[in-house]
Amino acid sequence: MNQLEQLKQFTTVVADTGDFQLMKQYTPQDATTNPSLILKAVQKPEYRGLLEQAVRDYHNEGGVDAVMDGVLIAFGCEILAIVPGRVSTEVDARLSFDTEATVEKARHLIRLYEQRGVARERVLIKIASTWEGIRAAEILQREGIRCNMTLLFSLVQAVACAEAGAQLISPFVGRILDWYKKQAGDQWDAAANAGDNDPGVRSVRQIYDYYKKFGYNTEVMGASFRSTAQIVALAGSDLLTISPDLLEQLARTEGTVERKLSVDLAQAGNIARIPADEPAFRWQLNEDAMATEKLAEGIRLFAADAIKLEKLVAEIAG
């Protein structure tokens, strides 16, 4: 049995792509998108028609902003025709520090999905794990709008999300590894930071164990992988969202995949609670240079790709 099929025995496998044609062969349960993945997809000839249709359908309703939302919904609906579960659709990263605007955008996206006949239970609204984003999620969850908290790099972000009642978090693995490699430079020891010792893997394991120890219902979905080794090291996580390239590698690789994370192991661990009110959140995040820098960088990158997509829409709209 290949590694992908073995992984599915322990973990819900999610496709991390906007390229819905590509995901079919891996039969994922759910799918995740973000501005960068949508931008990448719409530049392919086979998806140009979706973009042009969104311009025709939405431009007269509210210009470029309306078309941007329409593109997200169009991709989401196509994806939901393939996966049996949920799709994650991301709120504009430029709203990451505005609770009210994030809530309004999320409500609007859900309305658009419901107009297309998609039940809100099949949609996760992706929101950056800033303090303001977490407060937005708290409001939305009470309204039955389920949230996927993204750009999450630290335990305090994860705890704040769980205490807010978020449906799901997406702790990043690869971007954490990237930061530590860059900091170490020529002194980086790849062997010492592989497998279970990978700093990104350690971060997700710490979050998973904390959640299971203290009985939080928020789902843990590891994200942002650089290798199949990172994925295999997190077998047993509630979900893992994986790019098509790495899904392909897992599907082609024979070899044993063992459960690495489990509720029993987590509950047996000696784990202390940490505070995650606003002062504690801001202080602990500030003290974590990696999390602070990667959160800020991630917001900038997603915002930049949203702007590129807007320009593409404006060109088509004429």
Swiss-Prot record:
InterPro entries: Aldolase_TIM, TAL/FSA, Transaldolase_1, Transaldolase_AS. It is found in: Cytoplasm. GO terms for molecular function: transaldolase activity. CDD domains: Transaldolase_TalAB (cd00957). It is an enzyme of class 2 (transferase). Homodimer. The gene is tal. Keywords: Cytoplasm, Pentose shunt, Schiff base, Transferase. Its main location: cytoplasm. GO terms for cellular component: cytoplasm. Transaldolase is important for the balance of metabolites in the pentose-phosphate pathway. It catalyses: D-sedoheptulose 7-phosphate + D-glyceraldehyde 3-phosphate = D-erythrose 4-phosphate + beta-D-fructose 6-phosphate. Signal peptide: none annotated. GO terms for biological process: carbohydrate metabolic process; pentose-phosphate shunt. Its EC number is 2.2.1.2. This is Transaldolase.
